[in-house]
Amino acid sequence: MYYTEEEVLEYVKEEDVKFIRLAYFDLSGKQKNATIMASELPRAFEDGISFDASAIKGFEDPNKSDLFLFPEASTLSVLPWRPSAGKVIRMFCSIRYPDGKPYKKDCRYLLKTAVEKIKNECGLELHFGTEFEFYLFKLDENGLPTKIPFDNATYMDLAPEDKGENIRRNICFTLEQMGITPVASHHEEGPGQNEVDFRYSDALTTADNASTFKWIVRTKAAESGLYADFSPKPIQDKPGSGMHINISSSDDSKNENILAGILSHIEEITYFLNPTENSYNRLGELKAPRYICWGKENRSAILRVPASKGNLRLELRSPDSTCNPYLAFTLLIHAAIDGIKQNLKAPPATNKNLFDAKIAKSSSYKTIPDTLDEAKNCAENSDFIKGILGEL
């Protein structure tokens, strides 16, 4: 539902809202927030709420440390796990300089700019969806997370083997209460590993929902005395956890250009899709692809076109949940723009099983970077990345 500032102010008054959480993100995609009293909301809409940017990772600049948070009324959601008396609401914020100009390191602003660019220059809109995998681990006697899985179930098992069923149920209910539509959930292949999927949307909404989703999962796991682990490879000899990104276009005739554009820039983008050392423990093992190619329904290809009765979609299978979805989507949109403007053509699809080591080694496909250092070096030397993100 879309709210105006006037409607939010009226809602706060009528529903006895006491606290307003102003949410924003650092460059790693970690959600931050400042809480203000309801009486301060008109000022926040009008003048913004200042904060010390020098204390935020990636924002550090003591000479220009004063930035302002401006809540976006359209992103209003109620926190359903807080008391109903004295409600708490949250809004995502745009970050601005004191003169009112957008802050250049605001990752939501970068994504908004990319969305406008592909609309204005290519005449289309991209929709995004995400598929999150995560592990549920037990806590030790001190309340600290262990690497002991909550259960030993496997892919799509039922209770009692699947002990995560009720937690996934609570996650889905909470998603609905916060305006996010869940579509499916199940136990994944690893012990204690789960997946919950929610409906696709425009790029900014999906990035906002992805960040909210991780917060909800961690909160609901903690309420059950568990730890939700989104790391790419928490247990070395077990399946890793990815964040597959699904992309569809408002103009199917551009799908080949979009696919080709993403493949042509995937090496440079990998640093932002897989930004931790642990990310590279997952890639290339147990259904986590690393070969730069595409296939129809082929899960061993880094980019695949799933079977579908509706609009075609692309599924990028290499990303993981440690990425900043705003930066990831921004770069993917720019790669799509490049593919469209240059009229890039996709290489032939592969039907090879690249999870088979012998088949993979005999293929001629390039791979994405093998390590974080390689990925970082590739990004730092990329004119494509510099042209979009500057010196972030």
Where are these regions (language model features)?
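Glycine-rich, acidic/polar active-site loops that bind/position phosphate-bearing ligands
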Residues: 1-392
